Amino acid sequence: MVAYLPLGITCGSSFANLNRMEALYRTMTSLCARREYCCADIAEKLRKKGASQEQTAVLIDRLIEEGYIDEGRYARAFVHDKILYNGWGRVKVAQHLRAKGVCPAYIQEAMPCITEEQYAEAFQKVLRSKQRSIKGDTDYEVRQKLARSLIARGFEPSYVFDNMNLDYVEE
């Protein structure tokens, strides 16, 4: 198929491919301008839009070069939001970042962006919320259920047992 351009210039499928790339680029910059994305998220969105692996690689490189994608910035935002707003622990956050293919160095760098006070506050919020809904016959049973629930939310087992006070368990 031949496309006709103004001034009598003709061009083959490479012109259509160029327009497609530019349209995909504009779509991805619009998405990245609204919130943080990692490379894996953008690659998945491009795959769903029908982009080839080569096009995906070129577009992701361009987005990184122009500052639309920054894995370190993404990791910091992810850690902040998941701990403070979703009540996740460090273990679960790190696991999800690894699953998205974020570099371990960025994960390590992002973890300290949450202070110990903020982390303790998030832990206590989840603890209070869960203790209202967990039922058991004995204090021991309630504490075990509570501990399992907190560990499943991604809080470190040692942190859970060190910071879970009997004062929070009501009969």
Task: Report the location of each language-model feature.
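An alpha-helical, amphipathic repeat domain used for nucleic-acid recognition
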Residues: 3-171
